[in-house]
């Protein structure tokens, strides 16, 4: 089973009321939450760990997970409020205003870390949950605790505007977590933010030198690549009409993990010896699933039968 660990929040998405007025409607979201949902829909064994409120918005989150076949037994429930993000869409690109102080997600602490059964093979971490303490330190502690026995994957999903005034501490945390991870996923923009300018494969090999076994890089509408010490495999993206890009990278992550699960490769040994065929299958499922997500509004990952 793959345990996605990170933020769950309510996206307030812009809509138009029946009276023609501008309004916002609540939708379950969060980068890591979206990956858990996409994994469940793709038929992979998926579970989710996060701080989730007992309020009505928290119930929306829990119900949405259950509807997509995600195991919710590891949720750390509390009476703190739910994180809310108001979303503005301009030409399909999303910008966010976050309301996160004192929430169930942000205040997650190490004493809420679950004891995990042996059936959990893989931890997926990332997103804005790695920015603010105490939650960020809690997720890092979970990775540090379990990285010796379970596969861990990280996608920082970097939002430079969200880390203003915290960049040094954030870079240090991401550096530590990347070094512990078996699998790293970065957009081309994130890779440049972390490693500077240069050719993508060379920069990815710099990441590999820190400890990971494979780096997946998404290159927007062009496609995605997988880089190991000896491999550099690229798969072109499907051409689709883009409605918006919300959840695209999150869905890609799920496709990669689902494909690796299908190949029985989510073990420490398996991730260290991925074949060209397995990497190609992972890139293919990731890009195909993401193409469906961007072709419709919001983070609405595909079910397996849609592929």
Give residue spans per PLM region.
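Short gly/ser/thr-rich secondary-structure transition/capping motifs
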Residues: 101-110, 164-169, 271-272
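Hydrophobic anchor at the start of a short beta-strand
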Residues: 45-46, 72, 150-152, 215
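Glycine-rich phosphate/adenosyl-contacting loop at the front of the ribokinase-like
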Residues: 1-70
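Conserved beta-alpha-beta core of the PfkB/ribokinase-like small-molecule kinase fold
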Residues: 122, 128-205, 212, 222
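Conserved N-terminal subdomain of the carbohydrate kinase-like
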Residues: 45-128, 132
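Conserved phosphate-binding/catalytic region of the ribokinase-like
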Residues: 196-307
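Short glycine-enriched, charge-decorated loop/helix-capping segments at active-site entrances
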Residues: 18-26, 164-167, 272-273
């Amino acid at each position: 089973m793959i345990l996605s660990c990170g933020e769950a929040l309510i996206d307030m998405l812009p809509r138009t009321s029946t009276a023609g007025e501008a309004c916002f409607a609540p939708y379950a979201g969060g980068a890591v939450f979206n990956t858990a949902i996409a994994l469940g829909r793709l038929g992979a064994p998926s579970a989710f760990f996060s701080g989730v409120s007992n309020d009505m918005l928290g119930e929306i989150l829990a119900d949405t997970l259950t509807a997509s076949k995600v195991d919710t037994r590891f949720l750390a429930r509390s009476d703190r409020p739910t994180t809310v993000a108001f979303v503005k869409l301009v030409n399909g690109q999303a910008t966010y205003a976050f309301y996160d102080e004192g929430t169930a997600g942000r205040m997650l602490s190490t004493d809420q870390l679950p004891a995990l059964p042996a059936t959990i093979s893989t931890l997926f971490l990332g997103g804005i949950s790695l920015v603010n303490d105490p939650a960020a330190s809690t997720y890092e502690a979970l990775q540090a605790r379990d990285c010796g026995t379970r596969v861990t994957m990280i996608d920082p999903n970097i939002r430079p505007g969200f880390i203003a005034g915290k960049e040094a501490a954030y870079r240090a945390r991401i550096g530590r977590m990347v070094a512990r991870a078996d699998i790293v996923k970065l957009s081309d923009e994130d890779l440049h933010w972390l490693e500077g300018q240069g050719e993508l494969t060379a920069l990815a090999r710099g990441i590999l030198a820190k400890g990971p076994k494979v780096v997946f890089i998404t290159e927007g509408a062009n496609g995605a690549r997988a880089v190991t010490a000896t491999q550099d495999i690229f798969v072109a993206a499907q051409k689709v009409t883009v409605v918006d890009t919300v959840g695209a990278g999150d869905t890609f992550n799920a496709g990669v993990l689902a494909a690796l699960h299908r190949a029985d490769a989510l073990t420490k040994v398996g991730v260290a010896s991925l074949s060209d065929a397995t990497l190609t299958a992972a890139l293919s499922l990731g890009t195909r699933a993401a193409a469906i997500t961007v072709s419709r509004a919001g983070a609405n990952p595909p079910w397996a039968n849609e592929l």
